[in-house]
Protein backbone atom coordinates (compact mmCIF):
# COMPACT_ATOMS: atom_id res chain seq x y z
CA UNK A 1 0.00 0.00 0.00
CA UNK A 2 1.38 3.42 -0.98
CA UNK A 3 0.63 6.07 1.66
CA UNK A 4 1.09 9.81 1.36
CA UNK A 5 1.21 11.29 4.85
CA UNK A 6 1.43 14.97 5.62
CA UNK A 7 1.36 17.31 8.60
CA UNK A 8 0.41 20.97 8.17
CA UNK A 9 -0.33 21.70 11.83
CA UNK A 10 2.90 23.60 12.55
CA UNK A 11 5.91 25.20 10.86
CA UNK A 12 7.79 21.90 11.37
CA UNK A 13 5.41 19.97 9.13
CA UNK A 14 6.03 18.23 5.84
CA UNK A 15 5.12 15.20 3.79
CA UNK A 16 6.26 11.58 3.75
CA UNK A 17 5.81 8.72 1.33
CA UNK A 18 5.58 5.17 2.67
CA UNK A 19 5.12 1.72 1.16
CA UNK A 20 3.30 -0.04 3.98
CA UNK A 21 5.61 0.65 6.96
CA UNK A 22 8.69 1.25 4.81
CA UNK A 23 9.73 4.90 4.38
CA UNK A 24 10.43 5.88 0.77
CA UNK A 25 11.13 9.59 1.14
CA UNK A 26 10.17 12.71 3.06
CA UNK A 27 10.11 16.46 2.51
CA UNK A 28 10.15 19.00 5.32
CA UNK A 29 8.44 22.39 5.40
CA UNK A 30 10.52 25.53 4.97
CA UNK A 31 9.73 26.83 8.46
CA UNK A 32 6.63 28.79 7.49
CA UNK A 33 2.97 27.83 7.72
CA UNK A 34 2.08 28.93 4.18
CA UNK A 35 0.80 25.48 3.34
CA UNK A 36 -1.75 26.65 0.79
CA UNK A 37 1.20 26.78 -1.63
CA UNK A 38 3.90 24.82 0.15
CA UNK A 39 1.97 21.56 0.61
CA UNK A 40 1.44 21.08 -3.11
CA UNK A 41 5.05 21.95 -3.92
CA UNK A 42 6.29 19.46 -1.32
CA UNK A 43 3.99 16.73 -2.62
CA UNK A 44 5.05 17.28 -6.23
CA UNK A 45 8.72 17.15 -5.23
CA UNK A 46 8.23 14.04 -3.11
CA UNK A 47 6.44 12.09 -5.84
CA UNK A 48 8.85 13.22 -8.55
CA UNK A 49 11.87 12.02 -6.56
CA UNK A 50 10.19 8.64 -6.09
CA UNK A 51 9.20 8.40 -9.75
CA UNK A 52 5.54 8.11 -8.80
CA UNK A 53 2.30 9.89 -9.62
CA UNK A 54 -0.40 11.09 -7.26
CA UNK A 55 -2.85 8.65 -8.86
CA UNK A 56 -0.70 5.78 -7.55
CA UNK A 57 -1.31 6.72 -3.91
CA UNK A 58 -3.59 4.20 -2.18
CA UNK A 59 -4.21 6.08 1.06
CA UNK A 60 -4.00 9.74 2.05
CA UNK A 61 -3.04 10.35 5.69
CA UNK A 62 -3.30 13.79 7.26
CA UNK A 63 -2.57 15.27 10.68
CA UNK A 64 -5.86 16.61 12.01
CA UNK A 65 -4.55 18.70 14.92
CA UNK A 66 -4.27 20.19 17.37
CA UNK A 67 -2.12 22.99 16.01
CA UNK A 68 -2.35 25.89 13.58
CA UNK A 69 -6.01 26.31 12.67
CA UNK A 70 -5.23 27.58 9.18
CA UNK A 71 -2.70 24.82 8.61
CA UNK A 72 -5.14 22.15 9.76
CA UNK A 73 -7.83 23.40 7.38
CA UNK A 74 -5.40 23.44 4.44
CA UNK A 75 -4.30 19.87 5.17
CA UNK A 76 -7.83 18.56 5.55
CA UNK A 77 -8.99 20.27 2.36
CA UNK A 78 -6.08 18.81 0.39
CA UNK A 79 -6.65 15.30 1.73
CA UNK A 80 -10.37 15.49 1.02
CA UNK A 81 -9.83 16.88 -2.46
CA UNK A 82 -7.25 14.29 -3.50
CA UNK A 83 -9.17 11.39 -1.97
CA UNK A 84 -12.43 12.47 -3.58
CA UNK A 85 -10.88 13.06 -7.00
CA UNK A 86 -9.08 9.70 -7.05
CA UNK A 87 -11.68 7.64 -5.20
CA UNK A 88 -9.26 6.81 -2.40
CA UNK A 89 -9.75 6.46 1.36
CA UNK A 90 -8.28 8.95 3.78
CA UNK A 91 -7.22 8.61 7.40
CA UNK A 92 -6.96 11.44 9.89
CA UNK A 93 -4.33 11.11 12.62
CA UNK A 94 -4.06 13.43 15.63
CA UNK A 95 -0.71 15.03 16.37
CA UNK A 96 -0.89 13.50 19.84
CA UNK A 97 -1.21 10.01 18.35
CA UNK A 98 1.67 10.73 15.97
CA UNK A 99 3.85 11.82 18.90
CA UNK A 100 3.22 8.50 20.64
CA UNK A 101 4.10 6.64 17.43
CA UNK A 102 7.37 8.59 17.14
CA UNK A 103 8.27 8.09 20.83
CA UNK A 104 7.54 4.35 20.96
CA UNK A 105 7.44 4.42 24.76
CA UNK A 106 8.30 1.16 26.56
CA UNK A 107 5.64 1.48 29.27
CA UNK A 108 1.88 0.99 29.35
CA UNK A 109 0.67 4.61 29.51
CA UNK A 110 1.76 7.48 27.24
CA UNK A 111 0.87 11.15 27.70
CA UNK A 112 1.89 13.47 24.84
CA UNK A 113 1.97 17.18 25.75
CA UNK A 114 1.72 20.19 23.42
CA UNK A 115 1.82 23.90 24.20
CA UNK A 116 -1.73 25.21 23.68
CA UNK A 117 -0.76 28.75 24.76
CA UNK A 118 -2.91 30.83 27.13
CA UNK A 119 -1.29 28.91 29.99
CA UNK A 120 -2.64 25.54 28.87
CA UNK A 121 -1.31 22.38 27.23
CA UNK A 122 -2.99 19.89 24.96
CA UNK A 123 -2.63 16.30 26.08
CA UNK A 124 -4.04 12.84 25.66
CA UNK A 125 -3.75 9.66 27.73
CA UNK A 126 -2.93 6.59 25.64
CA UNK A 127 -2.81 3.01 26.90
CA UNK A 128 -1.04 0.11 25.25
CA UNK A 129 -2.35 -3.30 24.34
CA UNK A 130 -0.30 -6.26 23.06
CA UNK A 131 0.64 -6.58 19.41
CA UNK A 132 -2.22 -7.86 17.27
CA UNK A 133 -2.47 -11.62 16.81
CA UNK A 134 -1.43 -11.48 13.16
CA UNK A 135 1.77 -9.68 14.11
CA UNK A 136 1.09 -6.95 11.57
CA UNK A 137 1.86 -4.12 13.95
CA UNK A 138 5.38 -3.96 15.41
CA UNK A 139 5.24 -3.43 19.16
CA UNK A 140 2.17 -2.58 21.24
CA UNK A 141 -0.96 -0.92 19.90
CA UNK A 142 -1.69 2.46 21.49
CA UNK A 143 -5.26 3.70 21.90
CA UNK A 144 -6.53 6.88 23.59
CA UNK A 145 -8.33 6.29 26.88
CA UNK A 146 -9.56 9.90 27.14
CA UNK A 147 -10.67 12.65 24.81
CA UNK A 148 -8.04 15.29 24.11
CA UNK A 149 -7.68 17.77 26.97
CA UNK A 150 -6.44 21.33 27.42
CA UNK A 151 -5.14 21.74 30.97
CA UNK A 152 -2.96 24.10 32.97
CA UNK A 153 0.20 23.04 34.85
CA UNK A 154 -1.56 22.50 38.20
CA UNK A 155 -4.10 20.09 36.73
CA UNK A 156 -1.41 18.37 34.69
CA UNK A 157 0.63 17.81 37.86
CA UNK A 158 -2.42 16.28 39.56
CA UNK A 159 -3.06 14.00 36.59
CA UNK A 160 0.62 13.03 36.43
CA UNK A 161 0.65 12.03 40.10
CA UNK A 162 -2.54 10.02 39.65
CA UNK A 163 -1.07 8.14 36.69
CA UNK A 164 2.29 7.65 38.43
CA UNK A 165 0.51 6.21 41.48
CA UNK A 166 -1.29 3.83 39.13
CA UNK A 167 1.61 2.71 36.95
CA UNK A 168 4.88 4.25 38.20
CA UNK A 169 7.67 3.98 35.62
CA UNK A 170 5.18 2.54 33.14
CA UNK A 171 4.01 6.12 32.47
CA UNK A 172 5.80 8.12 29.78
CA UNK A 173 5.30 11.84 29.16
CA UNK A 174 6.18 12.90 25.62
CA UNK A 175 7.13 16.41 24.46
CA UNK A 176 8.55 17.85 21.26
CA UNK A 177 12.14 19.04 21.33
CA UNK A 178 11.29 22.58 20.14
CA UNK A 179 8.41 23.03 22.61
CA UNK A 180 10.13 24.86 25.46
CA UNK A 181 6.91 25.50 27.37
CA UNK A 182 6.03 21.80 27.41
CA UNK A 183 9.61 20.86 28.33
CA UNK A 184 9.36 23.21 31.32
CA UNK A 185 6.60 20.97 32.70
CA UNK A 186 9.27 18.45 33.69
CA UNK A 187 9.31 19.85 37.23
CA UNK A 188 5.59 19.05 37.53
CA UNK A 189 6.03 15.38 36.61
CA UNK A 190 6.84 12.74 39.27
CA UNK A 191 10.40 11.43 39.07
CA UNK A 192 9.12 7.87 38.72
CA UNK A 193 7.59 8.66 35.34
CA UNK A 194 9.56 8.56 32.09
CA UNK A 195 10.22 11.72 30.07
CA UNK A 196 10.65 11.34 26.30
CA UNK A 197 11.52 14.05 23.77
CA UNK A 198 10.64 13.63 20.09
CA UNK A 199 11.27 15.79 16.99
CA UNK A 200 8.50 18.05 15.73
CA UNK A 201 8.32 16.43 12.27
CA UNK A 202 5.47 13.90 12.30
CA UNK A 203 4.57 13.24 8.64
CA UNK A 204 6.16 9.78 8.75
CA UNK A 205 4.34 8.85 11.94
CA UNK A 206 1.07 10.05 10.39
CA UNK A 207 1.64 7.69 7.45
CA UNK A 208 2.55 4.74 9.71
CA UNK A 209 -0.43 5.18 12.03
CA UNK A 210 -2.75 5.52 9.03
CA UNK A 211 -1.40 2.33 7.48
CA UNK A 212 -1.97 0.39 10.69
CA UNK A 213 -5.53 1.74 10.87
CA UNK A 214 -6.16 0.87 7.22
CA UNK A 215 -5.13 -2.74 7.82
CA UNK A 216 -8.02 -2.94 10.26
CA UNK A 217 -10.44 -1.17 7.93
CA UNK A 218 -10.45 2.03 10.01
CA UNK A 219 -10.33 4.58 7.20
CA UNK A 220 -12.56 7.51 6.31
CA UNK A 221 -14.49 8.72 3.34
CA UNK A 222 -13.47 12.30 2.45
CA UNK A 223 -16.68 13.75 3.93
CA UNK A 224 -16.03 11.96 7.25
CA UNK A 225 -12.69 13.67 7.85
CA UNK A 226 -12.77 16.21 10.68
CA UNK A 227 -10.34 18.49 12.49
CA UNK A 228 -9.09 17.67 15.99
CA UNK A 229 -8.97 21.13 17.52
CA UNK A 230 -9.60 20.08 21.17
CA UNK A 231 -10.28 23.70 22.11
CA UNK A 232 -13.24 24.19 19.81
CA UNK A 233 -14.04 27.73 20.94
CA UNK A 234 -10.61 28.89 19.74
CA UNK A 235 -11.18 27.25 16.37
CA UNK A 236 -14.50 29.02 15.92
CA UNK A 237 -13.01 32.38 16.85
CA UNK A 238 -10.12 31.92 14.41
CA UNK A 239 -12.49 30.80 11.66
CA UNK A 240 -14.37 34.10 11.96
CA UNK A 241 -11.22 36.25 11.75
Task: Place the predicted regions along the sequence by residue.
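Surface "functional belts" at beta-alpha junctions
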Residues: 22, 34, 89-201, 229, ...
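Generic secondary-structure signature for well-ordered alpha-helical cores
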Residues: 48, 52, 190, 212-219, ...
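Stable alpha-helical structural segments in soluble proteins, enriched in small hydrophobic residues
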Residues: 46-50, 85, 103, 206-214
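N-terminal beta-alpha supersecondary unit
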Residues: 1-66, 200
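Glycine-rich phosphate-binding/hydrolytic loop that grips phosphoryl groups
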Residues: 197-227
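A general structural signal for well-ordered alpha-helical segments in protein cores
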Residues: 36, 40, 79, 96, ...
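DPxDG-like acidic metal-binding loop motif
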Residues: 61-92
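A residue-level signal for conserved active-site and pocket-lining positions in enzyme catalytic cores
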Residues: 67, 82, 173, 207, ...
